[in-house]
Swiss-Prot record:
Signal peptide (residue range): none
Protein name (database record): Aldehyde dehydrogenase B
Entry EC no(s): 1.2.1.4
Function: Catalyzes the NADP(+)-dependent oxidation of diverse aldehydes to their corresponding carboxylic acids, with a preference for acetaldehyde and chloroacetaldehyde. May play a role in detoxifying aldehydes present during stationary phase. Cannot use NAD(+) instead of NADP(+) as the electron acceptor. To a lesser extent is also able to oxidize propionaldehyde (propanal), benzaldehyde, mafosfamide, and 4-hydroperoxycyclophosphamide. Does not use either glyceraldehyde or glycolaldehyde as substrates.
Outcome after substituting R197E: Less than 10% of wild-type acetaldehyde dehydrogenase activity
Keyword flag NADP: yes
Primary gene name: aldB
Subunit composition and interactions: Homotetramer.
Keyword check for NADP: yes
Length: 512
């Protein structure tokens, strides 16, 4: 912890991407920038170079209380704001984000390490689209009327929960914040949001850009360690819901916290997603086969730091040798390096600690008897990038009972094995504690459909992978989570239903 601003900091503009940052960022509470109550800040390093990016508020319980005070002060006013006005504000937020797309994308790259080509073409545009989508959904949402009898009617109303807590992961900081904020705000809730300690920057810049569009207190952002303020927020009796994206282990704790106050939770947790390639993908040397090869290589998307990372590849035995020759060649052609270079396809891991975790898992795989087919080493770059957190995309061959097949690594490490029949592929796919995502690749529509229905996962991509449209439901089976994010059904996760049962009859029941 430090109390003084840094005397010098890295200048992102040196790489040709202008990004003017403040030396220090506070919390956003009640529509204002508020210094942490204890006056402490932590150093936020960029994974691009391993150097200081900025300092960020290191908050405590008093800061969460201030945010909750601000949210409760305005919650009734925001809840009674018309859906037309709430939707209009969400559209304005999306427009402001679009006007500042390059700024947000560049900040996300510096803070997280992912390539600028991803943040500018995927992360930020998707975040923008989610605000527009839920602005549209809330305008289209209707209540319901049930006629009990000719003189009795049940009216059903959607009402906001009140003040909700949201805890954001470090792998998609801005997108995950948008996934949670957009439906919560559309439904009429106020938000206390905690960004990940490793990647707070893009959300803070977002509030600089759009904070004036919202009534003070509707959105509050408090920075700091999850073990301190995340736990305090999740256990607070002053929130009506908690939404969390992160590891299964922490998700279990969040769920226990929520039970203390009997509040609903949305949990999007870990995964070990199978990506299944049937023999017919090689029937033709065509665009579909090329697409399948790209689908295989997508384990390296976002440096493998994705809950739905296709980190297990199941390849039909009859094509294994031929398929893997082409697949390895495709993976080895991935351009990794400086995330701020627009041709870079794979950037830096988010932190030195995460880099070490991934390398440790590669060692575990070797000790278990897995063969390293490519990669497996830290990638050393030159110049100002020499202290960045870079890794070679890695493919291991082994058996599904190995730890590298069963445990979430959260890095660009793919565990590959083979299967003979559809039944064996299905058994291997479901042999995991997780059930967040899966991929199926086949030219046979009937086969792909049967596999998709049989796989125990909340989303099964068929002849595609890593698409996250706003109007497609996302969430996990088994230990991958509870509830769904995205899609209009998400509105109901931030609402409660009131039934107003009205009798228009003058006649008594006649019971007493």
């Amino acid at each position: 912890m430090t109390n003084n601003p840094p005397s010098a900091q890295i200048k992102p503009g040196e790489y040709g991407f202008p990004l003017k940052l403040k030396a220090r960022y506070d919390n956003f509470i009640g529509g204002e920038w508020v210094a942490p109550a204890d006056g402490e800040y932590y150093q936020n390093l960029t994974p691009v170079t391993g150097q200081l990016l900025c300092e960020v508020a290191s908050s405590g319980k008093r800061d969460i209380d201030l945010a909750l005070d601000a949210a409760h002060k305005v919650k009734d006013k925001w809840a009674h704001t018309s859906v037309q006005d709430r939707a209009a504000i969400l559209f304005k937020i999306a427009d402001r984000m679009e006007q500042n797309l390059e700024l947000l994308a560049t900040a996300e790259t510096w803070d997280n390490g992912k390539p600028i080509r991803e943040t500018s073409a995927a992360d930020v545009p998707l975040a923008i689209d989610h605000f527009r989508y839920f602005a549209s959904c809330i305008r289209a949402q209707e209540g319901g009327i049930s006629e009990v009898d000719s003189e009795t009617v049940a009216y059903h109303f959607h009402e906001p929960l009140g003040v909700v807590g949201q805890i954001i992961p470090w792998n998609f900081p801005l997108l995950m914040a948008s996934w949670k904020m957009a439906p919560a705000l559309a439904a009429g809730n106020c938000v206390v949001l905690k960004p990940a300690r490793l990647t707070p920057l893009s959300v803070l810049l977002l509030m600089e850009i759009v904070g004036d569009l919202l009534p003070p207190g509707v959105v509050n952002v408090v920075n700091g360690a999850g073990g301190v303020i995340g736990e305090y927020l999740a256990t607070s009796k002053r929130i009506a819901k908690v939404a969390f994206t992160g590891s299964t282990e922490v998700g279990q704790q969040i769920m226990q916290y929520a039970t203390q106050n009997i509040i609903p939770v949305t949990l999007e947790l870990g995964g070990k997603s199978p990506n299944i390639f049937f023999a017919d993908v090689m029937d033709e040397e065509d665009a579909f086969f090329d697409k399948a090869l790209e689908g295989f290589a997508l384990f390296a998307f976002n440096q493998g730091e994705v809950c739905t990372c296709p980190s297990r590849a199941l390849v039909q035995e009859s094509i294994y040798e031929r398929f893997m020759e082409r697949a390895i060649r495709r993976v080895e052609s991935i351009r990794s390096g400086n995330p701020l270079d627009s041709v870079t396809q794979m950037g830096a891991q988010v932190s030195h600690g995460q880099l070490e975790t991934i390398l440790n898992y590669i060692d575990i795989g070797k000790k278990e008897g897995a063969d390293v087919l490519t990669g497996g080493r830290r990638k050393l770059l030159e110049g100002e990038l020499k202290d960045g957190y870079y890794l070679e995309p890695t493919i291991l061959f082994g058996q599904n009972n190995m730890r590298v097949f069963q445990e979430e690594i959260f890095g660009p490490v793919l565990a590959v094995t083979t299967f003979k029949t559809m039944e064996e592929a299905l058994e291997l796919a479901n042999d995991t504690q997780y059930g967040l995502g899966a991929g199926v690749w086949s030219r046979n529509g009937n086969l792909a459909y049967k596999m998709g229905r049989g796989i125990q996962a909340g989303r099964v991509w068929t002849n595609c992978y890593h698409a996250y449209p706003a109007h497609a439901a996302f969430g996990g089976y088994k230990q991958s989570g509870i509830g769904r994010e995205t899609h209009k059904m998400m509105l109901e996760h931030y609402q409660q239903t009131k039934c107003l049962l009205v009798s228009y009859s003058d006649k008594p029941l006649g019971l007493f």
